[in-house]
Amino acid sequence: YQGMCYVTEHWERWIDIFQAMRDQRGAKRNDLWINLTCYVNPSPWFLQWGNSVWMQNSQDIGRLNVKRPSQLDQLLSYRDDRYFDFVKTRAFQFPLAHLYNHDPIYGNTANLAGKMDDDEFRTYLMMMATRGSAFWELYYSYNMMNEGQKWVINADVLHWINDNYETLKHAKLIGQTPAKGTPYGYSAWSGQEGIISVRNPSDEVKEFTFPLDRTIGMPEGLKGLHRTYVWAYRTDEQKAEDTENHLFDYGGQISLSLQPGEVRIWKFSTVPDKEAPALRIVKTTSPTSLTVELNEPVILKDGIFSVSGNEVTATSLSADRRVVTL
């Protein structure tokens, strides 16, 4: 009908090619990642042969200014709005883990040089990490990655994604599209652990309430969950609602007030994190300074470090949040 026989033959040939590519690899057939991009309908049917499919409803790069002109906010608001369009408006039944888009982007051609400081860059990567995407192409200009400590941040975030991917791959949208200026985020759960991100895309303080139930992917009946911070941007990490020592259960809800542009990312687990960070390396860098490397990220507080027989007059934290200079 109207030339559709050609389309059928076209894709049958491509499927034969995909199959031949995997067959040629023998026992390593599943080590090949096939990403289907231009002019491919985003149907889960293709996941029989490919691993990821371009979302198709989005430009390579786009900006959406919801009265927050920073590049961090415009880039996140644009792409996450496209996710809401894909999942909610078009109602495509497609696992987010296998959805491809052109993120992250930090390159000269995109006119982004000098447009994100280190905290913005980490927030950019961490927020998109909670989308659950399995396939990342890093659209970076190497000269721009020398700004601040972006190479270190990039490596740290990718390690975190790899360590938590069994949870992240189950990501679901929560809230409403950032195009409306309303809070939103992603929720991912696996077994007795979960990761939730929330973001306020607007220039106003917003209240956000969401349920802890199956609508956000939480396993039914899960109880006794401890919450810990993964990352926070434009927020006071000592806010009462995040430091109260109470547990979360299935059927409850989370309500919070988000500042303009604020991002919070939490991890939930039935097992409390009671183990203190451990020292990996301590070395002298000058007659009056030490570098301390820990095995996990830390938040600097007064009095947290002491050196026998010496006064600690200043501390600084590297971009990976694990290396402290005293």
Residues of each region from the PLM?
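Short, surface-exposed alpha-helix to beta-strand junction/turn motifs within ectodomains of secreted
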Residues: 297-316
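A short glycine/threonine-centered beta-strand motif
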Residues: 288-299
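Short, solvent-exposed loop/linker segments at the N-terminal edge
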Residues: 282-286
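Active-site groove signature of glycoside hydrolases
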Residues: 1-5
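Low-complexity "stalk/linker" and mucin-like segments enriched in Ser/Thr/Pro/Ala/Gly
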Residues: 237-248, 310-319
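Aromatic sugar-binding surface patches on proteins
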Residues: 320-325
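Active-site-proximal substrate-binding groove within the catalytic cores of carbohydrate-active enzymes
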Residues: 14-245, 253-265
